[in-house]
Amino acid sequence: MKKNNRVVVGMSGGVDSSVSAYLLKEQGFDVIGVTMQIWQDKDEEAVRVEGGCCSLSAVNDARRVANKIGIKYYVMNFKDVFKEKVIDYFVDEYLKGRTPNPCIACNKYIKFEELLKRAWMIDAYYVATGHYAIKEYDEERGRYLLKKSVDTSKDQTYVLYNLTQTQLEHILFPLGKYKKDEVRELAKNLGLPVASKPDSQEICFVTDNDYGKFIRENAKEEIKPGEFRDTRGRFLGYHKGIIHYTIGQRKGLGISVGKPLYVVDIDAENNVVVLGYGDEVFGDELISYNNNFISIDKLEREMRVKAKIRYNAKEQDAVIRPLEDGKVFVKFDNPQRAITPGQSVVFYEGDIVVGGGTIERKVR
């Protein structure tokens, strides 16, 4: 595709994507705003999670912003692919006793794959979002790099580690060198109707933040109760179904043995939730799969990195080593709490994202 200055901006109705659209227009881009219709409930009405990118109010907010800054605006239907790649994945992972991150799946398959395809169909070379991240081309490496944003408290590179070189060529992150308060101030000065709109906190398609209810309604199989056992296999009681538990969880277990118990493992095959004491929640080794690397073509030898195992975690010193089947062995210098299958581990060198993958299991 011939390079041009047309860009599709994914507009969620929030302040970040709204300011992104404005900044790109000011930079001379031919900006087209698009809101992705991604999820509807069984009554075919838009899910209304307050502040969420799926709500009808979000569409109205995005349209008002587009009118205010003077850009074209469309709503595009991504419902079927979103259900397949995000909803079904979310439900299936919980049924397997794992804890998924739907935002990572949405970025990988929807925002930077499907939306990019739609952009190309309307002759737009770029897709832009309101993510806090920086993209740069490194002449020496001959590669695009993904780097942490200036506002480290808002940095979103953890959920972007799956980006490919082709995708990075066609992606713009206008907010990478801004701080959040600067973005809000700019929106306020521009008179944008979303200037003071709060950030979305919950998963956009789960109403009331009730994961269990959502999974029960969308699962193809019955959620069955099962047994709690300790790390030696001794029976402790009964659980309500493995979808209600995640590694490191303490609350809501309904089991009392005199000392606090935590979820340390989930055996989906046998429908068993394994409980242990505080020290048993920690581990310093894991294996990741579905790995993607950005700053390097592939991992060919042992490498010292900083790594983190969840979005809000602090980076920790670690060594990563390639395994024969494309998986990666990760050894932390210090034990980490609640290494959780289904979540992602992301590797950094300073501000540069090396890559990352999905946690398959804790080794020890």
Curated annotation (Swiss-Prot):
Subcellular location: Cytoplasm
Major site of localization recorded for this protein: cytoplasm
A Pfam family hit: tRNA_Me_trans_M
Binding-site residues for ATP, renumbered to this chain: G10, M11, S12, G13, G14, V15, D16, S17, M36, G130
GO terms, biological process: tRNA wobble position uridine thiolation
Site feature: Interaction with tRNA: H131, Q343
Enzyme class: transferase
PANTHER family on file: MITOCHONDRIAL TRNA-SPECIFIC 2-THIOURIDYLASE 1 (PTHR11933:SF5), TRNA 5-METHYLAMINOMETHYL-2-THIOURIDYLATE -METHYLTRANSFERASE (PTHR11933)
UniProt-recorded name of the protein: tRNA-specific 2-thiouridylase MnmA 1
Species per Swiss-Prot/TrEMBL record: Thermoanaerobacter pseudethanolicus (strain ATCC 33223 / 39E) (Clostridium thermohydrosulfuricum)
Name of the coding gene: mnmA1
